[in-house]
Amino acid sequence: VEVAQAIAEKLGLELVVDDMGFDAALTAVQTGQSDMAMAGITVNDDRLKVMDFSDSYATGVQVVIVKEGSSIQTVDDLANAKMIGTQKGTTGYIYCSAPVEEDGYGEDHVTGYDSGALAVMALMNDQVDAVVIDNEPAKAFVEANEGLKILDTEFAVEDYAIGVDKGNTQLLDAINGALKELIADGTVQSIVGKYITAE
């Protein structure tokens, strides 16, 4: 929200925030309900078919949370998990639910939850064997819940960008122009550093 606010100020526009779930945010842009979507969105081929993306403003890291003492000790061990928890619509969900021949684990081995917190709760209650989620929320969940740990190996590294309706080049160009200035003067880095790892 703070990056969006900084962009709006650069463009002389008023920011109206409509807080919604991840999938809903993507749909809202496609249907014209929202001008742009910012929710830790990463660019992938499926999303590029239905929306356009700004230049990247940060790099995110997906990690794996397990219970201490779990038989899952490395990312490779995820292949042996009976069930993996993720947040619906996120990159972790997309990667994990992809067919095995596409390096995923298949939809039968993945449960998508409405939030990362619900996925972690499912892990605590032994409904899933592991949770794949962004690094920063993962650290907060592990800190708040005794008996959880993050695997040493990263699951995936990805670029975050802002989604706009396909073909809205005027808005996209304006956002990219503002982002360029905000990255150059350090504004984006100082905001992003509070929330996600941006290397």
Model-derived features with residue positions:
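A ligand-binding cleft/hinge motif common to bilobed small-molecule-binding domains
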Residues: 24, 41-49, 95-98, 122-125, ...
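Short helix-initiation/N-cap motifs at beta->coil->alpha
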Residues: 16-28, 71, 110-122, 158
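Extended ligand-binding regions for polar small-molecule ligands
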Residues: 1-10, 76, 88-90, 161-199
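Ligand-binding clefts/hinges and TM-proximal coupling segments of bilobed small-molecule sensing domains
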Residues: 91-110, 146-151, 180-199
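Alpha-to-beta junction loops
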Residues: 12-14, 30-39, 82-83, 115, ...
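Flexible hinge/capping segments at coil-to-helix
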Residues: 66-83
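Extracytoplasmic small-molecule ligand-binding "clamshell" domains
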Residues: 1-40
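Periplasmic-binding protein-like
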Residues: 59-66, 135, 139-180, 196-199
